[in-house]
Regions:
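Phosphate/adenylate-binding glycine loop and adjacent helical scaffold
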Residues: 3-11, 15, 19, 107-108
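Eukaryotic proteins' extreme N-terminal regulatory segments
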Residues: 13-42
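A generic structural signal for short beta-strands and their flanking turns/coil linkers
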Residues: 18, 62, 93-95
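Generic structural "secondary-structure junction" signal
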Residues: 21-24, 63, 68, 76, ...
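Short, well-structured hydrophobic secondary-structure segments
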Residues: 34-77
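Short, intrinsically disordered, mixed-charge
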Residues: 37-38, 85, 150-153
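Aromatic- and Lys/Arg-enriched surface recognition patch
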Residues: 79-126
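Well-ordered alpha/beta subsegment
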Residues: 116-121, 126-154
């Protein structure tokens, strides 16, 4: 399957607008879940730092999620609950993407590397993995998931 997504989401779409971000440093979904949970405990809330505030924030807040790319594939998502503008000690603006701490594991979907975040249309998001939040498929190796998907079993 060719990599999906080029960062452009200008075409109309039914459903909410989403964001996608690289999970830098995470080796798998469980590692990402642990890192995000640790940061949630340290901070008292779940958020992701970014320099640029999304111009289409309202469309994302209408049910959108932050999709996480782990090792070249979208693998999980967190619902976006808000955006908060902040300033650092030097007066530079940045944005916090507020997220629900709960993870939803998705079926793998290839995605090219990029920096920062990108918009993702509802038509381009991967399906949630069977089993719901934290799905039973989260422990399955990528190659097995891809094979089951190619066979039409998931």
């Amino acid at each position: 399957m060719p990599p999906r997504g080029n960062g452009h989401a200008s075409l109309p779409s039914s459903g909410p607008l989403h964001l996608v971000k690289m999970a830098v440093g995470a080796v798998d979904v469980d590692d990402l879940r642990r890192l995000r949970a640790q940061r949630h405990v340290e901070r008292g809330e779940s958020w992701v730092y970014t320099r640029n505030h999304p111009r289409r924030a309202e469309a994302v807040l209408d049910g959108g999620s932050l999709y996480w790319v782990v090792k070249g594939q979208i693998r999980a998502r967190q619902r976006v609950t808000g955006f908060r503008k902040e300033h650092d000690d030097n007066g530079r603006a940045y944005c916090l993407i507020l997220t629900d701490p709960e993870f939803v594991v998705t079926l793998p979907r290839a995605f090219r590397p990029f920096q920062g975040w990108r918009y993702l249309l509802s038509a381009d998001v991967p399906k949630d993995a069977p089993g719901g939040p934290g799905g039973d498929f989260s422990m399955m190796p990528d190659h097995m998931l891809m094979e089951l998907r190619e066979l039409g079993l998931i």
